[in-house]
């Protein structure tokens, strides 16, 4: 059976509870739409306009729908704006189970124990304490972590006994431990008052409020065999409007509220700044007082959440001029979550675990060095969690507990075998990294001499990239290249690049390109990105890199390639190329290669070898034999060797 939110809306309206559920306790007005998804219906549906009963009933009945019922175009628009990905029920269940394991200090989630009878509490962990445990879902959307009335992907109703949300679990405890209606209502309200969520968009917030109040309704009806009355739900509705509030989680303010603020005479002065939206207020029910939400971030605050859980927005596509790039914002929500609770469990992109992606490198390292952080689950293929969604680097469920020390992650891989290999390799003598001899794809640059000789060249290049020896430079500036080595008085480099989607060589005057440390040396060359090569585990086995080749002195490359080494003799370059082709080296490269890019930093854990005749490796052997020498050098056992040879494809 599918959920029908409109039926809930009409039922609540008939009981006089719909209007109260539209209240914004901070502004004293109604919650705002905070989305342009309904603008086609007129200005009353603008993002800064209030949601009223008249706009969601009568002629507009059916306008508010769950995610599963929304028109495809609306889903697409909303998903793009803040890169929403909707949390599947099984993920909600796993994450909520873990919070219960932490609270109960025992294995198995609360709902699993319910199938065998009542939830087991004791004198140290009472059901009343469980009910009053303060838990918050950030950016809650329709509230999947709070209540699971239906499957968010399909809209199918979930039977009460199989629901797994935070409030579902509390209401279950209330039903099992109370004997009268009045006692049940008393503790159900306490459960509500200790369950929180905030959301940016008004329609989603309204749905989450409806889901919460209707979950109380359905739990009451199941326990007592009759529907609750309006008066019995009045306190519950009040708690819902305080505890589920509208907020921009990055500013702690009511979204778009300043567009509704009346201007004072002072505001009309020429230099006056527009008023900012008000900071959101929430209620501390234990002290019967309200606080600005931002005050919870202070060290001396009297109110903190016991647990924070959620699935924050991943990126913001509403800002910036680059249509191909949307800045990440999930790390900002992580930072803010750590300020309001000692214990935080979130699902989010995992690229930072490999010090990759667009989150700040300093932030990535801070997270990797944090002894209070652990990764509960890692999914290299994000579509395992979010169908039809591609997230480079995968997604992770992280758990942060300020009062526990798990040891810093420092280096993350999802495979135990790779972790042990990594420890052996890094701990083998004084570790030197291959990263030191890898040259970035942007090593070569055009010169002022070229621009002086070809003053119109700048107009043929991208803005801000007048000196880039770009991947498409052969097509962009054909006038500075020759197919064959010219017979004139100038000196030339042979440049490897791509033309008409194929590798090719062209000649360019030396004075048009800067010289690097390996320009006049032998070097190993690889494509700077190779999506088909894959990563460890995707596919199995994976190549990790493309095919390497040797370039000699006076050979250079466009930005399509990286180069490795600066060798005086070709034999050493050949030895390095053999090493790059080993399964061992590509496995170590795979520790940090979670996207198709192969920049120098990805080679951090590939150990540098001696490529001269004095090496402890006999480079005259085949690549397969060199692999065996490397396995022995680093003391790898059969299980570790088997992991490498099953996960990384052989290269001759």
Where are the regions a protein language model picked out?
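C-terminal effector/catalytic modules and regulatory tails appended to multi-domain proteins
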Residues: 31-37, 613-617, 640
């Amino acid at each position: 059976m599918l959920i029908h939110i409109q039926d809930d809306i009409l039922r609540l309206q008939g009981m006089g509870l719909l209007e109260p559920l539209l209240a914004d306790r901070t502004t004293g007005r109604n919650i705002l739409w905070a989305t342009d998804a309904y603008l086609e219906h007129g200005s009353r549906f603008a993002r800064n306009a209030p949601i009223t009963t008249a706009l969601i009933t009568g002629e507009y009945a059916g306008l508010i729908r769950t995610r599963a019922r929304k028109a495809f175009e609306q889903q697409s628009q909303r998903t793009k704006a803040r890169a929403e990905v909707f949390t599947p029920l099984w993920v909600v269940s796993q994450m909520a189970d873990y919070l219960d394991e932490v609270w109960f200090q025992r294995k198995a989630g609360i709902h699993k124990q319910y199938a065998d009878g009542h939830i087991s509490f004791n004198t140290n962990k009472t059901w009343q304490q469980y009910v009053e445990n303060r838990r918050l879902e950030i950016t809650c959307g329709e509230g999947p972590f709070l209540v699971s009335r239906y499957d968010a992907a399909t809209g199918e109703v979930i039977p009460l006994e199989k629901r797994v949300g935070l409030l579902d679990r509390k209401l279950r405890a209330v039903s099992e431990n109370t004997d009268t209606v009045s006692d049940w209502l008393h503790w159900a309200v306490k459960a509500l008052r200790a369950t929180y969520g905030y959301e940016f968009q008004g329609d989603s917030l309204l749905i989450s409020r409806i889901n919460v109040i209707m979950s109380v309704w359905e739990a009451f009806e199941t326990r007592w065999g009759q529907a609750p009355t309006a008066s019995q739900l009045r306190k519950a509705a009040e708690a819902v409007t305080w505890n589920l509030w509208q907020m921009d989680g990055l500013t702690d303010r009511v979204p778009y509220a300043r567009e509704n603020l009346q201007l004072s005479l002072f505001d009309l002065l020429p230099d006056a700044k527009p008023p900012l939206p008000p900071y959101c207020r929430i209620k501390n029910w234990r002290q019967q007082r309200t606080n600005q939400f931002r005050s919870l971030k202070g060290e001396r605050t009297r109110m903190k959440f016991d647990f924070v859980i959620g699935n924050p927005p991943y990126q913001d596509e509403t800002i910036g001029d680059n249509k191909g790039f949307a800045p990440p914002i999930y790390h900002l929500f992580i930072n803010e979550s750590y300020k309001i609770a000692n214990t935080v469990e979130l699902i989010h992109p995992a690229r930072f675990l490999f010090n990759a992606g667009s989150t700040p490198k300093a932030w990535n390292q801070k997270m990797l060095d944090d002894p209070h952080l652990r990764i509960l689950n890692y999914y290299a293929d994000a579509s395992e969690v979010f169908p039809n969604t591609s997230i480079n680097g995968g997604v992770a469920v992280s758990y942060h507990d300020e009062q526990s020390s798990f040891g810093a992650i420092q280096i993350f891989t999802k495979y135990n075998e790779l972790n042990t290999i990594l420890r052996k390799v890094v701990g083998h003598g004084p570790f030197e990294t291959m990263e030191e001899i890898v040259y970035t794809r942007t090593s070569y640059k055009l010169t002022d001499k070229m621009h002086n000789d070809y003053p119109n060249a700048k107009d043929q290049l991208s803005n801000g990239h007048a000196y880039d020896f770009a991947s498409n430079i052969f097509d962009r500036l054909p006038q500075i290249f020759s197919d064959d080595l010219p017979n004139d008085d100038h000196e030339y480099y042979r440049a490897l690049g791509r033309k008409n989607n194929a590798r090719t060589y062209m000649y360019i005057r030396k004075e048009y390109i800067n010289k690097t440390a390996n320009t006049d040396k032998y070097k190993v060359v690889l494509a700077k990105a190779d999506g088909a090569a894959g990563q460890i585990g995707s596919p199995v086995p994976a190549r990790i890199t493309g095919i390497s080749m040797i370039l000699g002195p006076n050979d250079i490359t466009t930005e399509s390639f990286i180069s490795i080494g600066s060798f005086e003799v070709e034999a050493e370059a050949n030895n390095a190329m053999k090493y790059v082709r080993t399964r061992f080296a590509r496995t170590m490269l795979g520790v940090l290669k979670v996207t198709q890019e192969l920049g120098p930093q990805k080679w951090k854990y590939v150990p540098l070898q001696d490529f001269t005749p004095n090496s402890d490796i006999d480079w005259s052997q085949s690549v397969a034999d060199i692999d065996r020498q490397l396995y022995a050098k680093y003391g790898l056992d059969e299980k570790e060797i088997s992991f490498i040879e099953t996960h990384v494809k052989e290269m001759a």
